[in-house]
Amino acid sequence: MLILFVEYHTAFRQAASYMLDQEVDLVVVSQASSVAEGREKMAQGGIDTAIVDIPLPDEGASELVRDLHEANPSVPVLVMTHIEDEAIHKKFVEAGASEVLPKTMTYEEILAAVRRLGDELLR
């Protein structure tokens, strides 16, 4: 599965990408640190799923999720956040996120969610 990872914390994004790349079936093919950069990477294509952290430093993370979903509805978008507000989670699901996960999850739980989304692609 080819992944676009959008996260503004460089160390977290790089570490998580490295860990995902160690999995035989996953490759982080593109990384972005902002909505603007995420849009650029999205336009390049070649992704099977996207992981988007919220909030992002520039405004419009929900629009990025909407753009990702509208550009290719078959590409699942996984949103990760430290925000525990159900209204915000609902906003991102309505924008097209397949799932909204708390950043307090373990790596194994995140990995399971990514693979679950990948399995949906194969259906």
Q: What are these model-predicted stretches?
A:
Residues I51-L68:
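Conserved phosphotransfer microenvironments
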Residues A87, M105-R115:
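C-terminal output helix
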